[in-house]
Amino acid sequence: MSSGKITQVVGPVVDVAFAAEDKLPEINNALVVYKNDDSKQKVVLEVALELGDGVVRTIAMESTDGLTRGMEVLDTGRPISVPVGKETLGRVFNVLGDTIDLEESFPADFEREPIHKKAPAFDELSTSSEILETGIKVIDLLAPYLKGGKVGLFGGAGVGKTVLIQELIHNIAQEHGGISVFTGVGERTREGNDLYWEMKESGVIEKTAMVFGQMNEPPGARMRVALTGLTIAEYFRDVEGQDVLLFIDNIFRFTQAGSEVSALLGRMPSAVGYQPTLATEMGQLQERITSTKKGSVTSIQAIYVPADDYTDPAPATAFAHLDSTTNLERKLTQLGIYPAVDPLASSSRALAPQIVGEEHYAVAMEVKRVLQRYQELQDIIAILGMDELSDEEKTLVGRARRIQFFLSQNFNVAEQFTGMPGSYVPVAETVKGFKEILDGKHDHLPEDAFRNVGSIEDVVAKAAKMKF
């Protein structure tokens, strides 16, 4: 095991010099520095660049406080490796695979896998087209998720990305009994803590492994924690043959962390100050998230959109890798419609008659047509009022508003805030409900009856209790 000495510390970036006779560590190898000769207090560094003359530039996975020039650095001879297997379920890890849930840690000889791997070979990939039922009406009807696909949840700050992810974890675990890996990348520690205790209370934690590299951690940890979560998910797929759900909240923070260290590594910034290697880094992560003949990894990624600008390089780079997009719209939160999913901006390549069936496809297309026409008529309504519309247009507006409200529903994970029990709506019920609204069967019911309910039967029951 070769050793070197720290020559420079600039924030999270550390330069290490090795003697001429020592073998230089390979790129992505993990190096270890022990603070104050205390074997418990160590900092792990990852090799990013070889500068020549026996010097390597590394990124710290933990705070570099207390590191000084001249400290000894040991090469572990391999990349960061993390625990894998069924024992990881119900546990919480950091980027290095250390447990952070105050329970017993894993022994040193426990099975581990390196976080840096190649994507599966082309001939190992599977191309199935099976729908993953989420129980959330707006998603299942208009932008369905594919098993083994990649889904992006796009939205600005505070529009409900994390709540939607929590509901998806809840529904998949309760209704499908599926294994999930939740990766918190650069998000709020409070949210991670809340999620952990909520999942523990509901029993969902037994089917979930959690990995966190939160906002307060150095950029190195936020850059690599997504790979830690992915490595755990890949093991379930490749060795256990499972269908796994990988949640990443938030993929933008992965890009942001890379941007923070990019200039310190000596790279010239590109558009909007992002790292020039943005597309490569995103590709290396996304290409590993795929389905093989052994099992599948379905990933659901929250993607923060800076200043609601979809042309920003970070969300734009992520777009290229996705099968489905779920766009969250601030205007809908102002109308009190939750989840605030934009039915016209959200899309999915699974919304095709050969995948979802003729009836589902026809209903979804008609819902989109009605909502699109309603959007076009809103300018006329705002200027001239409803009286200037034809009878046909007035009927269409009434149905569009009912559809818009019916796309909302109460979430199980939001019950503590709303005081209303959540609802899981099967796809068949969703299609039936919207078909009845389009056919005019419920034109006589008040619009408010359609707000925050599950199936169409719930609408009828709610309307019966209302005075109108």
UniProtKB/Swiss-Prot annotation:
This is ATP synthase subunit beta. F-type ATPases have 2 components, CF(1) - the catalytic core - and CF(0) - the membrane proton channel. CF(1) has five subunits: alpha(3), beta(3), gamma(1), delta(1), epsilon(1). CF(0) has three main subunits: a(1), b(2) and c(9-12). The alpha and beta chains form an alternating ring which encloses part of the gamma chain. CF(1) is attached to CF(0) by a central stalk formed by the gamma and epsilon chains, while a peripheral stalk is formed by the delta and b chains. It is an enzyme of class 7 (translocase). Keywords: ATP synthesis, ATP-binding, Cell membrane, CF(1), Hydrogen ion transport, Ion transport, Membrane, Nucleotide-binding, Translocase, Transport. It is found in: Cell membrane. Its EC number is 7.1.2.2. It is a peripheral membrane protein. It catalyses: ATP + H2O + 4 H(+)(in) = ADP + phosphate + 5 H(+)(out). GO terms for molecular function: ATP binding; ATP hydrolysis activity; proton-transporting ATP synthase activity, rotational mechanism. The gene is atpD. Produces ATP from ADP in the presence of a proton gradient across the membrane. The catalytic sites are hosted primarily by the beta subunits. The keyword Transport applies. The keyword Transmembrane helix does not apply. It comes from the Bacteria. ATP binds at residues 155-162. InterPro entries: AAA+_ATPase (IPR003593), ATP-synt_VA_C (IPR055190), ATP_synth_F1_bsu (IPR005722), ATPase_a/bsu_AS (IPR020003), ATPase_alpha/beta_chains (IPR050053), ATPase_F1/V1/A1_a/bsu_N (IPR004100), ATPase_F1/V1/A1_a/bsu_N_sf (IPR036121), ATPase_F1/V1/A1_a/bsu_nucl-bd (IPR000194). It comes from Streptococcus suis (strain 05ZYH33). One of its GO terms (cellular component) is proton-transporting ATP synthase complex. Belongs to the ATPase alpha/beta chains family. SUPFAM superfamilies: C-terminal domain of alpha and beta subunits of F1 ATP synthase (SSF47917), N-terminal domain of alpha and beta subunits of F1 ATP synthase (SSF50615), P-loop containing nucleoside triphosphate hydrolases (SSF52540). Gene3D superfamilies: 2.40.10.170, Bovine Mitochondrial F1-atpase, Atp Synthase Beta Chain, Chain D, domain 3, P-loop containing nucleotide triphosphate hydrolases. Its main location: membrane.
